[in-house]
Amino acid sequence: MPLGPWERVEAALTLLAIDPAGLKGLWLRARASALRDRITGALGALPLPVRRIHPTIGDDALFGGLDLAATLSAGTPVVQKGILDEPAVLVLAMAERTLPGLAARLGTALDAPRHCLIALDEGAERDELLPLGLVDRLALFLDLDGLPWGETREIALDPERLAAARARLAAVATPPEAAATLARVAAQLGIASLRAPTLALAAARAQAAWEGHAAVTDEDIRRAADLVFAHRAMPASEEAPPEPEPEPPEDQPDDSPPPPEQQQGEEMFPEEMLVEAVRAALPADLLEQLAAGRAARMARGATGTGSAKAGNRRGRPLPSRMGRLGTGARIDLVGTLRAAAPWQPLRRRQQKTDAVLLVRPSDIRIKRFRETSDRVLIFAVDASGSSAMARLSEAKGAVELLLGQAYARRDHVSLLAFRGRDAELILPPTRSLVQTKRRLAGLPGGGGTPLAHGLRLALAVGLQARARGMTPTVALLTDGRGNIALDGSANRAQAEEDALKLAASLRGSGLPAVVIDTANRPQPSLAALARALDAPYIALPRADAHKLSNVLGAAMGD
């Protein structure tokens, strides 16, 4: 029988309290509320101390090290311990805002069986999600969205029964077929990660210990698969029925051996039942949210000369500020001495010392810089049909005009063309005008319109550019009449559906875009595509290179 919403909460917390290090933790998707407090209040049942952390926590707090301010004040080395030095339950607030660096550090800490992470995901939007590296490592997931308060109750975990379960956990026997069954079920559910069946096996052992079983049973496996696989499973796809096996001739005796004894009876772990049970518990829309990711906040508002961010390593200097010395921070020595100088006579009298310099933590000044990333404008040009050469000429001219100002605006440009049955990267991101003219010379055109292929390649180029620290923008130039689907077929309806799906992926990735309709009359299909991209739509028939360059400059905020 499937678990109810609150029964699922209690079951997850019970297993986590038995083996927190083996299950790694819990992804709790819920806004701050009394309901969430009811769940976090039950974390006291876990056999580890609770430590609260936040997305901006520094390496000094996580790993410890030399406390420079205290060392300067005391005159002797002062070492502070880090949160990760001792096993703990790490409660991460606002987990959806976790940056990749912190996610990597927490993931490394979870790989050692010492800590347990409770990720409090407060994301209000579909694209605000926990980093996938942490999603993969945490065994359990709970979503409290839409759960009424009246259907909940106080969580009372029996401490004596939990202690007994922990004591017998190591002695629980695991049948060899249990791990194989979980691995096959994960594969049938479309789960690629190898961590998932390992975590499910740990959950099954914890469930067996809770129930007092000497070995893992099929019911333990079913409960573990429900709790660990449901939010990871891919939707069921329609598969073609298998071809019937040829029947042997009637006059030929059947010499095949009888099936093994285990197959003649009932399977110990019925895989089909496990798969159906997991699919029944599949959270609604979670897979689409995971596909969209949490990157839409990153590049949505990039304008001007690229994304600007405050840093402490390089860029245009900003006034220093008070702060603590942590990993990556650079002390402003002059600013620190200037802040400490007026207090020296008073400090010498208070400490009755003739030391030359007495520095307090409040004197520390940290250098700040404003870093500006380079922009890259990715032209995705429709090079198909009779008007291909005109569009390519416009794009070539616009690229050369933009490159002429690239050094002043820190711009790069890239050009890809889609025609025939595929898309091709003509020009990787560059600022070289000579290289650009050489690559653009003699670019062919004509054929079908694989619009979805162009969007897919633009997405790949944009993500690669962003990984290199650049701020990409996609400029799509087309007349909107896509007629080649992703599978290569000349199916206009499927091609339009594929293009809209790729547009949603591009929007979810956070890459800003602009759609330029080069048809003689505005195309409603392109306006719909622009809405799917959340991008400006500009109808620009008979555009020349100067007009196109001006439009793109305005769209990018110049």
UniProtKB/Swiss-Prot annotation:
Top-level taxon of the source organism: Bacteria
Biased composition (Low complexity): 298-308
UniProt keyword terms in alphabetical order: ATP-binding, Bacteriochlorophyll biosynthesis, Chlorophyll biosynthesis, Ligase, Nucleotide-binding, Photosynthesis
Chain ranges of the VWFA domain: 376-555
EC class name: ligase
Coiled coil: none
Reaction catalysis annotation: protoporphyrin IX + Mg(2+) + ATP + H2O = Mg-protoporphyrin IX + ADP + phosphate + 3 H(+)
Gene Ontology molecular function, alphabetical: ATP binding; magnesium chelatase activity
Chain residue ranges for the region called Disordered: 234-268, 298-325
Compositional bias per record (Acidic residues), positions renumbered to this chain: 240-254
EC number(s) per entry: 6.6.1.1
One Pfam family matching this protein: AAA_lid_2
GO biological process entries: bacteriochlorophyll biosynthetic process; photosynthesis
Pathway recorded for this protein: Porphyrin-containing compound metabolism; bacteriochlorophyll biosynthesis
Family label: Belongs to the Mg-chelatase subunits D/I family.
Role description: Involved in bacteriochlorophyll biosynthesis; introduces a magnesium ion into protoporphyrin IX to yield Mg-protoporphyrin IX.
NCBIfam families cross-referenced by the UniProt entry: BchD-ChlD, PRK13406.1
Protein name, as recorded: Magnesium-chelatase 60 kDa subunit
